[in-house]
Amino acid sequence: MDFVRLARLFARARPMGLFILQHLDPCRARWAGGREGLMRPMWAPFSSSSSQLPLGQERQENTGSLGSDPSHSNSTATQEEDEEEEESFGTLSDKYSSRRLFRKSAAQFHNLRFGERRDEQMEPEPKLWRGRRNTPYWYFLQCKHLIKEGKLVEALDLFERQMLKEERLQPMESNYTVLIGGCGRVGYLKKAFNLYNQMKKRDLEPSDATYTALFNVCAESPWKDSALQSALKLRQQLQAKNFELNLKTYHALLKMAAKCADLRMCLDVFKEIIHKGHVVTEETFSFLLMGCIQDKKTGFRYALQVWRLMLSLGLQPSRDSYNLLLVAARDCGLGDPQVASELLLKPREEATVLQPPVSRQRPRRTAQAKAGNLMSAMLHVEALERQLFLEPSQALGPPEPPEARVPGKAQPEVDTKAEPSHTAALTAVALKPPPVELEVNLLTPGAVPPTVVSFGTVTTPADRLALIGGLEGFLSKMAEHRQQPDIRTLTLLAEVVESGSPAESLLLALLDEHQVEADLTFFNTLVRKKSKLGDLEGAKALLPVLAKRGLVPNLQTFCNLAIGCHRPKDGLQLLTDMKKSQVTPNTHIYSALINAAIRKLNYTYLISILKDMKQNRVPVNEVVIRQLEFAAQYPPTFDRYQGKNTYLEKIDGFRAYYKQWLTVMPAEETPHPWQKFRTKPQGDQDTGKEADDGCALGGR
């Protein structure tokens, strides 16, 4: 036996009886840990170093070395050596790490846990309300008062933070409805439907006012497509529940259809209103006129046809209806002149179409009479729908026979548009030479002379105003219906009358005649029209009149003056005057000056404008960039080697300055339409796309 194995026998071999003594503390007579027993140095055989062993283990080794069997000791020593190696493997890491268990994990779970910890740090637990406890009705009145003052953010914060989190009150249906109505005024679609979802989660039954506010917020939303989808889904849900809408809710739905859809959907809603037995009012036709205005090509003809239907049903138009008619004359066209002539200049045929069939039966009872009135109204609407969307081939009818086009029987055409009075833009046909001026007012079907058979060229707002009587005829028609013009009516008239005409000069006199207080928008309209004509001095002459009425020019006034600054000295003088008045020009003013300089191809003037814009650090928007990119392009036929062009000889200098100017100018950031209404703007990074996605009823 070699010395190594002999040393192992003395070091490892021990009887089983002494193994228990290793775990018994000799001093206190209690069990002790195997590694925490009493330790003392012991010299191992054939070793020059001392080892720290427990006291019981030392005794065990000394006794076992004397009375153990060699063969048994050999197997026991090998087994104990393997157990010690298994126990000591991996124990070195205990000094550096305390983790005992490792699991597989993904990065997103760590991000979620980190986000939860961050939210807990940023949003502490709200404190309980310690003041006087209020009622939900008190919060309803407070939110209603704040919304009337235009403080929607404060109303939302009062409801969500103080009422729900601090006082922890159970809200009522009216608390949600008043906030949804406030969101509807500003078009805050996402928040309105969020409140509607919270309302349903609390098992609160929405009222008619709630649905009216929801349809109204869809109508006022800046994103028309997503608002239309949300409104249609809400309407489908109400139809699935057989929920009967009242007239106000139908008006909100009709308003949504007018602003987000087209005239066909408006007529569908209008027919549903009649089918449900509701009595249509002037307000109902006002929303139909809104739907007509959405069609910029044929909306003016649509508006006239809807107007005649309203009169045929015995309804008196209001001042708002007249204002909407002026908007149609300003923004919309007449469409196909031949179709318009067939539909608007033949009142007798139209009356027979709109007239319901006469019954030869005896007078019926009240219920039957009501059903008859309902049927009559439906016939009127269906006849109107057929005429509104009439194709040109259907309106013209069969071709005219050849004998009707004999040269000897041809009748002269007289175009009356050339007269400065703008009474009509029509073509008159008569056996005798017709008068040059024809008084025409299409608002009254019977007022159209029988000699007028077709329209001439109707392209400008002044031409369309002439078809409804002109300035004086329009105001006289309002007087017949006992309506007085307001400042909006006169402002719209100032936009549609022809610039430089005598009617334009009468507008200031009409202010005093009807005792209407003028506002800055009215004078800005007059200043803009004179500036577009190039009459800058005439536009400046209105400033003393404006000051005489106690009004102060704003940025829009200076912007309208900038439209007429075609000469460099006028534009630079305007910028100097604004600087003296301590008014900083905005992007719109510089855009108007840039447009005036581009029209004259004056690159020196253009560089001066850009220098002033750079000095004032006015941010640049997309419109200005588009204007300057157009100015920096060479004309398609420009050839610098063919000849000298006096207008384009300085374009290279402008291109060099423009390239350097772009690198130092700030860009204008368009704010989100709902940013100012959010209670926590810094934590809400919703974009327009997210807003659209959040408006889907299924995901609320």
Curated annotation (Swiss-Prot):
InterPro entries per UniProt: Pentatricopeptide_rpt, PROP1-like_PPR_dom, TPR-like_helical_dom_sf
PPR repeats, residue ranges: 135-171, 172-206, 207-245, 246-280, 281-317, 318-354, 519-553, 554-585, 586-620
Assembly behavior: Associates with mitochondrial leucine tRNAs. Interacts with ELAC2.
Keywords, alphabetical: Mitochondrion, Repeat, tRNA processing
Gene3D superfamilies: Tetratricopeptide repeat domain
Compositional bias of kind Polar residues: 62-78
Skewed-composition ranges (Basic and acidic residues): 681-692
Name by which UniProt lists this protein: Pentatricopeptide repeat-containing protein 1, mitochondrial
Subcellular location: Mitochondrion; Mitochondrion matrix
Tissues expressed in: Abundant in testes, skeletal muscle and heart.
Keyword Glycoprotein: no
Family: Belongs to the PTCD1 family.
Acidic residues composition bias: residue spans: 79-88
Region spans: Disordered: 49-93, 393-414, 672-700
Molecular function as annotated in GO: RNA binding; tRNA binding
Gene Ontology CC entries for this record: mitochondrial matrix; mitochondrion
Species the sequence originates in: Homo sapiens
Functional description taken from the UniProt entry: Mitochondrial protein implicated in negative regulation of leucine tRNA levels, as well as negative regulation of mitochondria-encoded proteins and COX activity. Also affects the 3'-processing of mitochondrial tRNAs.
GO biological process, one term: mitochondrial translation
